[in-house]
Structures are given as C-alpha cells and as structure tokens.
Amino acid sequence: MLEQQFAAEIQHIIDNKTKPLGALGQLEQVALQLALIQSQGKEQAATHIELKQPQMLLFAGDHGVADEGVSIAPSAVTQQMVLNFLAGGAAINCFCALHSIDLTVVDCGILLPVDSDAPNLILRRLGSRTANFAFESAMTIEQVEQALRNGQQIAAEKIAQGADLLMFGEMGIANTSSAAALLSALSGHEVDHCVGRGTGINEEQLSHKIKVVAQGVGRCEGLSVNAILAEVGGFEIVTMAGAFIAAAEHKTPVLVDGFIVSVAAYIATLLKPEVRDYLLFAHRSEEQGHQIVLSLLEAKPLLDLGLRLGEGTGAALAYPLLKAAAQFYNNMASFESAGVTV
C-alpha cells in the first residue's frame, strides 16, 4: 500500500495554490495521487511531479472463442491491426504521436504471426491463440504463470529504461468475450450484465455471445484466480495483469484505458491488492461491463466520451489531463508567493 506520511503535506501544497479549495476538481485528486506515488521511498514529499517519459504498451492476442461467432470481425484482423500499429496508421498511433507517447506492441500470441523486425515490436508468444473456452480451458496454468511473468518483465524493463508513466492498450478479436467471462467469474456478477456489443454485434449476436460466455463461466465456480484465468482468460489480458503488478512493484503509476484493460487491472488487484494505489482511470467506455469493473475498483474515470475502440486510445486522450495536473502542482503560485490574501 502507498505510504501516507507525506499525504497531508502534499494536500497542503495543493490547497495553498492561488484558487479556492477544491476548485480544480478531479485534477487535484490526480495531482495528489501522482505526487504521493512519486514520494514513495523518499525522505520528503515530492514538490515536483515528473511526467517526462510516458510509455504505451499495446498487448495483442487471439482467442479461440472467436470460432463461436462472438465478433463480427475474423481473427485475421488482429494481425492486420498489429501491422497497422507498426506502420503508424491506427487511432492509437495518431494520439500517441500527438502527445509524444512512446508506443510498443507486444505479440502475446496472435493467430497469424507478424514478420517484422520493427524495434517497437516485442514477441512474447504463448501460442497462436487461446483454446475455445466455450468447450475447454482457454489456457494452461503454465501459460497463465508465464503470461504473468512476461508482463512483469516487459513493464519492469520499460521502467528501467526511464518510463515514469505506463499506459496499456490491447488488440484481439473476441477479447471482450474473454474479459466479460473473467469479470463474471471473478466478481460473481451475472454474465448478461458483463457482456457487451464489442465490435458492434446486433441483438441476436449479443444473445448468442452471452450464451457462449456463460458456457465458460459455468466451469469457474469455486476456482482460484489463476485457475479462472486458465479457464476463460486471454494471452494479452493475463500478460497485461502481470504488467500492472510490476508497475506497482516499481512504484510507477498506470493510466488505465477501457473495459478490457480495466479487467486486467482488476485481476492484478486480486493477485496483489497494492496495485490499486497506482491506478488512475482514463475513461468510462460504452461496454456495460466497464461500469461494473469501475465500481469494483472504486474508480472515477476522467473522461466519458462514448469510446469503445480499445488500443489504449482512451488513456492516450486522457494523458494531457495528467500533464495539466502536474503543471498546476509544479508551477501554480501559492497564496504566499503571489502575495494574494484571502
């Protein structure tokens, strides 16, 4: 858990800026959390918030449950989008370029491997895709454990290279089905409350998707977290959970994207509760399951734009708000320094 000995001092710094108490709203909470994180292990409170090297990690993986027609897109699209990311043509590339966010793609196990020596591609393949969880376990326990280790290693390496804020994105056809199954199985919420429209399926397809997800969830009762990850998890989701754990271990904040990334964050908090203190939440997505996981994590997202793209786009769009929080904390005058009396 975050050490709180400097919390009052940081709050005093915020309260004594030239503004009414609380006038910057949620930005003040962001500044408090960032300053508190950056004070961990230090001898004094952080008087300056550093956000100089943001890192976006985009985890890609394919899902055997796609065979059940739970998405309107075929699994081949995952590879095509990975190539698009590497070529700089996706929405996430546009937003990362706008805000000077470094983007790295991680192949956790997509159906069609990418033949590329791009420097921003990391290969951590656990297979060509998960098994179809409608009928069998999606992953083995060994794959779950390796995925967690992979995520921890990747995040730790980026932090060692200077990253001071992490953001995670994802790509994988049918990964909303895996995320919904994980959320239902781990939280006990009804399947039909966790399943959403994903890529834009119609009512008939949604009903079918709920039934498919329920088949996997039905095998999960009474299982451990790792066993549930094996039953209905995804390579990219579990790898991402490991990355969340490493971020907390290395005292680095993570700006959390939408539904799938939030489910990975929830998994990480079940495995390591201290992860929660390092999470800031970018946005509220259109996926109905996202409302559930945000509630479970007691999270108040910064944006509500009706996004349902994934890729880390919501996190990239919210990043300037973190910069704004740091800017006022670092540079806004205090009442005393400005000679303002109240």
From Swiss-Prot:
Pathway: Nucleoside biosynthesis; alpha-ribazole biosynthesis; alpha-ribazole from 5,6-dimethylbenzimidazole: step 1/2. It is an enzyme of class 2 (transferase). One of its GO terms (molecular function) is nicotinate-nucleotide-dimethylbenzimidazole phosphoribosyltransferase activity. The active site is at 311 (proton acceptor). Its EC number is 2.4.2.21. It catalyses: 5,6-dimethylbenzimidazole + nicotinate beta-D-ribonucleotide = alpha-ribazole 5'-phosphate + nicotinate + H(+). It comes from the Bacteria. GO terms for biological process: cobalamin biosynthetic process. SUPFAM superfamilies: Nicotinate mononucleotide:5,6-dimethylbenzimidazole phosphoribosyltransferase (CobT). InterPro entries: Nict_dMeBzImd_PRibTrfase (IPR003200), Nict_dMeBzImd_PRibTrfase_bact (IPR017846), Nict_dMeBzImd_PRibTrfase_N (IPR023195), Nict_dMeBzImd_PRibTrfase_sf (IPR036087). Keywords: Cobalamin biosynthesis, Glycosyltransferase, Transferase. Belongs to the CobT family. PANTHER family: NICOTINATE-NUCLEOTIDE--DIMETHYLBENZIMIDAZOLE PHOSPHORIBOSYLTRANSFERASE (PTHR43463:SF1). NCBIfam families: cobT_DBIPRT (TIGR03160), PRK00105.1 (NF000996). Catalyzes the synthesis of alpha-ribazole-5'-phosphate from nicotinate mononucleotide (NAMN) and 5,6-dimethylbenzimidazole (DMB). HAMAP family: CobT. This is Nicotinate-nucleotide--dimethylbenzimidazole phosphoribosyltransferase.
